[in-house]
A protein has these predicted regions:
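Substrate-binding/catalytic cleft of secreted carbohydrate-active enzymes
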Residues: 90-93, 100-258
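Secreted/periplasmic carbohydrate-active enzymes, especially glycoside hydrolases
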Residues: 1-123, 151-152, 162-168, 184, ...
Length: 261
């Protein structure tokens, strides 16, 4: 059974990266005898995210992501991060004026989203999907993968949907293209039209262009970015990956961010 109701709230302080104002919501369920059955506490924020003429806006003002891809990884403990390590990560990001994180390439620990709510970090929440090396085969248009993909999408959405920090749902990473991504896109938009859907794989097959509300690319040159924006102003452009710290790389970052477009 599902039920919906609305409670008007006046004179709220809006949530943003600069001013991450939060409120405590308490939901109490009573039985017919007025006995408490369940109490839920939720940390919530009020904000309006919109896309206007290809420009992302939060609370009516243009926003630009200065972001990173973040893996849940520690050199000593592997993928088992402590809460203290997550807090350390968030403090490092804020000290570097980073305002956005893509949860590459899977949903993160639930505590991470609470920190992003509290400290004002925009989140691209990414599904646990990557078929690197086999993305020309899996999942593509194959119906045998659809239920599995939708199960992962639902799990992420239902767990994370109330976080004000999440501005986009991401369909995964380097998993090719195909009709399954249109199905995933439509699922998220049906559940949550207030957020955008992100997927870089549309650049591999323009047949499914509408699977992403964002023109997302990897390692494009600044010249290519400018050329796209001049020719295709409808979608916002995002470099979901543009620097990689393998070996002796990770230089020349300034040319990607010094000239806003």
């Amino acid at each position: 059974m599902q039920d919906q109701f609305e409670i008007p709230v006046e004179n709220t302080s809006l949530w943003s990266s600069e001013f991450p104002n939060l409120y405590q919501l308490e939901l109490v369920l009573y039985d017919a005898q007025n006995e408490i059955l369940e109490t839920i506490h939720e940390q919530i924020g009020f904000r309006k995210f919109s896309l206007e003429y290809g420009i992302m806006k939060l609370n009516g003002k243009r926003i630009v992501f200065h972001g990173i891809n973040r893996h849940e990884w520690d050199p000593k403990n592997g993928r088992c991060l402590s809460l203290e390590q997550m807090e350390q990560d968030i403090h490092i990001l804020k000290s570097l004026n980073i305002n956005a994180v893509r949860t590459s390439h899977y949903p993160n620990h639930s505590y991470w989203y609470k920190l992003c709510d509290q400290y004002g970090i925009y989140v691209i929440d990414e599904m646990n999907l990557e078929t690197h090396g086999a993305n020309e085969i899996i999942p593509q248009n194959k119906p045998e993968w659809t239920d599995c993909l939708l199960d992962r999408a639902r799990s992420m959405y239902e767990r994370d949907k109330n976080h004000p920090c999440i501005l986009m749902w991401s369909l995964g990473n380097e998993a090719g293209s195909g009709s399954n991504f249109m199905i995933l896109h439509d699922y998220f938009k049906e559940q949550d039209p207030s957020r955008l859907v992100h997927y870089e794989g549309i650049t591999q097959d323009r047949t499914f262009e509408n699977a992403s509300d964002i023109e997302s690319r990897m390692y494009a040159s600044p010249e290519n970015v400018k050329a796209y924006l001049e020719a295709h102003p409808i979608k916002p452009f995002m470099l979901c990956e543009y620097m990689h710290a393998m070996g002796n790389s990770l230089g020349l970052s300034l040319i990607h961010i010094s000239e806003p477009t």
